[in-house]
Amino acid sequence: MTDRVTVGNLRVARALYDFITDEALAGTDLDPDSFWSGVDKVVADLTPRNQELLARRDDLQAQIDKWHRQRAIGPHDADEYKQFLTEIGYLEPDPGDFTITTAGVDDEITTTAGPQLVVPVLNARFALNAANARWGSLYDALYGTDVISEEDGAEKGTSYNRVRGDKVIAYAREFLDGAAPLASGSYADATGFRIEDGQVQVELGDDQWVGLADPDQFVGYTGELGSPQWSILLRNNGLHIEILIDPDSPVGSTDKAGVKDVVLESAVTTIMDFEDSVAAVDAEDKVLGYRNWLGLNRGDLSEEVSKGDKTFTRVLNPDRTYTTPDGSGELTLPGRSLLFVRNVGHLMTNDAITDAEGNEVFEGIQDALFTGLIAMHGLKESDANGPLRNSRTGSVYIVKPKMHGPAEVAYTVDLFSRVEDVLGLPQNTLKVGIMDEERRTTLNLKACIKAAADRVVFINTGFLDRTGDEIHTSMEAGPMIRKGAMKSQPWIKAYEDQNVDVGLATGFSGRAQIGKGMWAMTDLMADMVEQKIGQPKAGATTAWVPSPTAATLHAMHYHQVDVYAVHKELEGKQRASLDDLLTIPLAKELAWAPEEIREEVDNNCQSILGYVVRWIDAGVGCSKVPDIHDIALMEDRATLRISSQLLANWLRHGVITEEDVKTSLRRMAAVVDEQNAKDPDFKPMATDPDSSIAFQAAQELILAGGTQPSGYTEPILHRRRREYKASVAGA
């Protein structure tokens, strides 16, 4: 039984109440009683509206399901379908031309294009690594990944391989030639660096010194001129590059110019995630996340890390200070990524707070209140608030996921306004990032932006969740194509193009981020470097990466592409059509061979089991899960949603049977067990699937997938995780 504190009509879990009262409110000048009274009032006033919005989702889905069932025989009539969606209010009127007016936004969001990390906030080590990933070693990123091949004696090995190191150095020199070219010659021939009359000069041998093609790219340096250990700071497309020189270092001693590393400004922004990458089902979990968020905003989060026989404490990096080129002043740059926080969406409740009747309070309301409160510590430096600051413009950046249409965005705006009143913050302090990951938001994106025109700081496409909603919305229309074929469908290209086009049409360039989705293949960095440049080329000012290393590698793309120049080329264009966006990804004919169907079912079942077993048994919401071919993929609830919805769709239309699903799950459970055999804490599923809560959760996600709200996985996952925690506690 959870110990609770009565606050008006609310019953707050003691762990949450004590944390907020004793830790989060400390140093804010807010009176605890007044704050909790405000929480009570916000919950009472906004809960009915939240419920109405969810009922509207269900009503629209029921009408769409009925429409498709009535037309099960015969071809799909696209014009009739579009008219129907308009009549029921699913498609809403275009709001006309406007420009967003969001003010007080940090440069990292408005004018600096670069990578964005998303990290589970429940894991302090991951959170610290991500916050510190503002700067990353290009040498390390190249040496440790497959961007540099292991051919011709360049194996990684267990100790430094000079052959591989030389390849890294050559790659970095070629990168510098593109990002900060010399007036003549190449960095590949550099034998020395110096500063003369406030300008950087590079020696190309035989005492031949050349400057930069654009001298203004040199913006600072560290160290004493003439000292062997120093660095040069360059800037290109708004991002910084630092060349570290130390001829006595292990790497510098092998380099003819004494360069020991090239450091890139990498994860310009990071999203600390309370949503799809975490497993937070109760007050205990939520407090862990809130406490880490507090440490990040106060600047005092730390974590003991062990590597081999060494243990050290990881803390947040300080800002970086450089001497200006003429030697007369200082330039200070942020040492940490600018932090967003992703709240949960409108659907879920959490028993961290209940009302007097025992009903759980909407988790999105809780997150807005508590993450907003905690973020106040990141707005100013003081003894009470901590030594570091997040925003330098006084803003709090909250990503709001899984909103369906303009009315839900308007509700979020009103929620944030009420939170500001409770916290005593100026209106529009809480900024919103709109995830364009639900079909009704995509189709009405301009109206969604209009609803938050004075708060919006980003729009972002999320292919996986968006595909999950695409399948669920049209669940009754017929069997869908295979998962791997989704990316080649007309609606996908239209979806990605429209997000950029609408963002530009509403004034995002220079004011807010236009984002694109995650690279999930965590070990395939060579492929990422080759392919992910397509996102900035398409107009994205940021795109998601799975690790600090990936952030450093992806940062190269923003040196190679001037995204704001791309915006000028794209402005005024409308590349996406509504007809393409409404094209349902139905299989034109069921021409799959039995082995193809089995492969698709096995692949999805393995993916579901591999992710769900860690979610339920270990409380891990974001996992590097090997797929059926042992390729490591970054999995979160979005990947789970699409996999479970596809199988639910095939089950609904008789492509597969319930027995096919159960048989595949049992077979794939053995595969997942084997993939996790080296984990001493892993509980095998295949030996007794009936008693494995994780196995049963995976099975339920598929068999009951057709009836889950919007195809979301959270209701089943949360219930089953609580069931597992209760079983462990009672053991």
From Swiss-Prot:
Keyword list, A-Z: Cytoplasm, Glyoxylate bypass, Magnesium, Metal-binding, Oxidation, Transferase, Tricarboxylic acid cycle
UniProt keyword annotation of Lipid biosynthesis present: no
A Pfam cross-reference name: MS_N
Broad EC category: transferase
CDD domains named in the record: malate_synt_G (cd00728)
Catalytic reaction annotation: glyoxylate + acetyl-CoA + H2O = (S)-malate + CoA + H(+)
Function text: Involved in the glycolate utilization. Catalyzes the condensation and subsequent hydrolysis of acetyl-coenzyme A (acetyl-CoA) and glyoxylate to form malate and CoA.
Protein name as annotated: Malate synthase G
